[in-house]
Amino acid sequence: MSLKEKTQSLFANAFGYPATHTIQAPGRVNLIGEHTDYNDGFVLPCAIDYQTVISCAPRDDRKVRVMAADYENQLDEFSLDAPIIAHENYQWANYVRGVVKHLQLRNNSFGGVDMVISGNVPQGAGLSSSASLEVAVGTVLQQLYHLPLDGAQIALNGQEAENQFVGCNCGIMDQLISALGKKDHALLIDCRSLGTKAVSMPKGVAVVIINSNFKRTLVGSEYNTRREQCETGARFFQQPALRDVTIEEFNAVAHELDPIVAKRVRHILTENARTVEAASALEQGDLKRMGELMAESHASMRDDFEITVPQIDTLVEIVKAVIGDKGGVRMTGGGFGGCIVALIPEELVPAVQQAVAEQYEAKTGIKETFYVCKPSQGAGQC
């Protein structure tokens, strides 16, 4: 049964009438451009065919009822006329409440709604299950009540809800790609202007995501340290962000910087340049160049930004040994575990899967999870 059928059937059973709309919003993977978002730089993600799906209908009162199919059909109810505060027990409900509250704060007027939510974006893998939920809820209200919001505004509202209501610091990339993704394309995003450019993906290329299943422990504290180091670097150059520093300016004075800060800055500057070049390489179908850029990105994350772990490096090496120069592979996400992403000709996927199955667990003692994805459409009716 599809997520659409599942949520529609649960909706009718729970609420006693049929849903009027079914909305989906996808998860995402970032192909290249790591830790560049909060430096006002460039990222190149694509939406994937794992998504959050919501069957819904408007109500003629001010009540919101939400059922979470993936959490034993837990039900949350709240009123649009009372202050919306955090739910004490259901963490999932706070993503919904936060999005609704922030839409209200933006002076959108809408009535009550019934929703049933289900999703298959793997949680905790760094594939943006939370952003896809936020964008799905925003799209539900926009569609049901014809709110004058575009995808970028729905994305910004979701980011605001996550930062301020849920209390988790995140950039804008995850929500933006979920809202604006385009089938068979990646999206080059300028994280300063929020400008986007759709970049066509070469035919016959699979987007493979492999979760190392290495439990991330350092990610929060180390992420904040990296942000501070980047801000220190920007201050040294008297610029608002590292986006505004050229590699030539950096090379001329690198020796004056604290050696660790210098390494962090070098990663951001070179990664921004790689990301812009990667968009051109993809568009021209130059998988060889894309592979080189992804390899450089991984080496930079490993040696200059120091956010990889041995398990991730091992996974990357296993995949690279199979694909050679026919594709690319690198760590994706915040670091210290999580996933790698590979762009691979479809005919090589079985060989990659076999090599990883035979070698990764033997070398690390951890079993990986393997996903083959297609670049997918952003949020909308399904």
Swiss-Prot record:
GO molecular function, one term: magnesium ion binding
Location in or out of the cell: Cytoplasm
Amino acids binding ATP: 124-130
GO cellular component: cytosol
Domain of life: Bacteria
Active-site residues, Swiss-Prot/TrEMBL: 174
BP terms from Gene Ontology: galactose metabolic process
NCBIfam families listed in its UniProt record: gal_kin, PRK05101.1
Entry's family note: Belongs to the GHMP kinase family. GalK subfamily.
Protein name: Galactokinase
Organism expressing this protein natively: Escherichia coli O7:K1 (strain IAI39 / ExPEC)
